[in-house]
């Protein structure tokens, strides 16, 4: 097989094809979905494998821990190892992990398998900077936005798709189907992706150490990571607590109806290509302001109507769409800004950015559960409102030099 080789040192002059963008976006969505398939099935899986109610939470927790560790220790390899080979190997690891989860006879091997599913799912965070490498500066935001739209659709659709599939096949069948999809995806990526050999010649240990240096000495990375951590915290809080709220006495929705609610929220993924185009035109500052304000307002509108009414349900659907739109917008703007800082350490920058993003989401989920248990939706929603407001306060302290850097980047 012959393959194209992307010169890591040479700026790209021609943008990648629409077909390649679609492939990368689809790959991101399919791989990211692996992180979420188990969430609506956790109760059934725990019961079959003999896990207690408390221990069942480990299914989601270990997947998230694996993903977080992968962001810190695997994603930076994109600056060191030939990218196509790294992406395909990571997707191949996902195949093995999903099969192991499907065939696990009891809890211990299953939990080990979902931990590996989490680690291997970081392939998405290799694909996004890979797309940026293949794209000239002038259209990088648009391309990254389109690829990120696939990621967000995968995240939003994974839970309802898993719930629907489980009506026809067992939870083991869901994992096996995903493994089959990953096999096909790995073969397609190997066949169609160009090779890209990074310039970095650092030892792996030095590569990891350099991430700390980048985190300490890159103001744009610090700010964009902080904004997105708060935004993803609000996003995770919303999607942790709304299923509880909708299934509770105010609305009494079934699991199928809640899945439809989640599908409506996926409409917010259309923000990704729009945000990318705004960043390419130098509108990052204004678009970020819009995203932070929109996220805060999304929580406020849920208090306009009385609980349990048709209007209040419609406002929750609207809040889901606008919140997802805002979070996706801010994510794409952040990645566009940090990818402009330097091609030679793009994967490390993305690893730091996404690890911070992920920690914000984990904290938001934990705080959301606590707030809902303490004060139902009222407490959870006001906490969700506070997160983007805090990010907005920090954002408004940006100096002129930082605004100029964002506009030029």
For the regions a protein language model found, what residue spans apply to each?
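Juxtamembrane intracellular "pre-TM" segments in multi-pass secondary transporters
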Residues: 6-14, 193-226
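C-terminal transmembrane helical hairpin of 12-TM major facilitator-type secondary transporters
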Residues: 286-333
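Helix-loop-helix hairpin linking two adjacent transmembrane segments in secondary transporters
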Residues: 139, 146-193
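Structural signature of the two symmetry-related core transmembrane helices
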Residues: 85-99, 286-301, 385
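Cytoplasmic helix-loop-helix junction between adjacent transmembrane helices
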Residues: 113-150
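Helix-to-loop junctions at the C-terminal end of transmembrane segments
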Residues: 71-82, 271-284, 372
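Intracellular juxtamembrane helix-capping segments at the cytosolic ends
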Residues: 123-135, 328-342
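Conserved MFS/SLC helix-loop-helix module at the cytosolic interface between two early adjacent transmembrane helices
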Residues: 69-107
């Amino acid at each position: 097989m012959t393959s194209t080789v992307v010169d890591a040192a040479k700026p790209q002059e021609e943008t990648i094809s629409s077909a390649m963008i679609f492939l990368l976006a689809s790959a991101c969505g399919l791989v990211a979905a692996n992180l979420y398939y188990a969430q609506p099935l956790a109760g059934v899986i725990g019961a079959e494998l003999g896990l207690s109610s408390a221990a069942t939470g480990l299914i989601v927790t270990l997947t998230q821990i694996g993903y977080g560790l992968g962001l810190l220790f695997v994603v930076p390899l994109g600056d060191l190892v030939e990218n196509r080979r790294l992406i395909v190997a990571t997707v191949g690891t996902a195949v093995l992990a999903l099969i192991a989860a499907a065939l696990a006879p009891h809890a211990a091997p299953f939990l080990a398998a979902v931990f590996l599913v989490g680690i291997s799912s970081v392939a998405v965070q290799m694909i996004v900077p890979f797309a940026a490498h293949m794209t000239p500066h002038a259209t990088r935001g648009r391309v990254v936005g389109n690829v990120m739209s696939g990621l967000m659709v995968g995240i939003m659709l994974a839970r309802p798709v898993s719930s629907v599939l489980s009506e026809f096949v067992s939870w083991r069948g869901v994992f096996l189907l995903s493994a089959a999809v990953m096999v096909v995806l790995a073969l397609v990526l190997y066949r169609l992706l160009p090779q890209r050999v990074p310039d970095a010649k650092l030892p792996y240990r030095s590569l990891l150490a350099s991430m700390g240096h980048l985190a300490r000495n890159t103001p744009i990375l610090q700010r964009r990571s902080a904004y997105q951590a708060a935004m993803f915290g609000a996003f995770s809080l919303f999607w942790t607590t709304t299923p509880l709220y909708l299934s509770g006495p105010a609305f009494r929705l079934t699991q199928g109806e809640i899945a439809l609610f989640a599908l409506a929220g996926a409409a917010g993924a259309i923000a990704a290509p729009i945000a990318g185009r705004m960043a390419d035109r130098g509108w990052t500052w204004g678009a970020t302001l819009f995203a932070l304000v929109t996220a805060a307002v999304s929580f406020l509108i849920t208090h306009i109507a009385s609980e349990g009414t048709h209007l209040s349900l419609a406002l929750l659907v609207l809040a889901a769409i606008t919140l997802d739109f805002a979070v996706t917008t801010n994510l794409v703007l952040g990645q566009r800004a940090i990818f402009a800082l330097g091609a030679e350490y793009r994967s490390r920058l993305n690893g730091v950015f996404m690890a911070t993003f992920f920690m914000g989401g984990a904290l938001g989920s934990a705080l959301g559960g606590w707030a809902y248990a303490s004060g139902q939706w009222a407490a959870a929603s006001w906490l969700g409102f506070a997160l983007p407001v805090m990010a907005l306060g920090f954002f408004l302290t940006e100096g002129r030099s930082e605004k100029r850097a964002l506009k030029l980047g």
